[in-house]
Amino acid sequence: MPRVLNLLVLALAAAIPAQAQEPRLGTIDFPTAAAPTAQAAFVRGVLYLHSFEYASAAAAFQEAQRLEPGFALAYWGEAMTLNHPVWNEQDRAGAQAVLGRLAPTPEARQVRAPTDRERRFLAAVEQLYGDSGS
């Protein structure tokens, strides 16, 4: 009998839709100049980032980059996944490498951001990870 019960539990678990296993991250309004598909991946990344799910956030931001390679805030987001202030951890070199994939210098990265708001987010991440260390 326990074997039948185990099989029944396994069958029921397999029948649960995959979306039920997706975490409940909430919603945000974070407008950008990105195309809708890249925007959706970006928003998912921000939601994961705000839930301290750094690996999932990085994957979502990388998906946004794949969908729209020039999407500046997707690189901003991936760089932000390398800052873990709660644990006093920061991968500055890794974040600089992420930003370097967008463009080689802070000035060149600023040009890639199409709106003032997006340029300000990039300026903030440059301050966080910049050469001054401040």
Predicted features and spans:
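Inter-helical turn/loop elements of alpha-helical hairpins
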Residues: 53-59, 78-112, 123-134
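Canonical tetratricopeptide repeat
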Residues: 41, 75, 116-123
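Bacterial N-terminal signal peptides
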Residues: 5-15
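Residue-level recognition of tetratricopeptide repeat
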Residues: 37, 70-72, 116
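Repeat-mediated protein-protein interaction surfaces in helical alpha-solenoids
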Residues: 20-33, 105-107
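Conserved structural position within tetratricopeptide repeats
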Residues: 63-66, 104
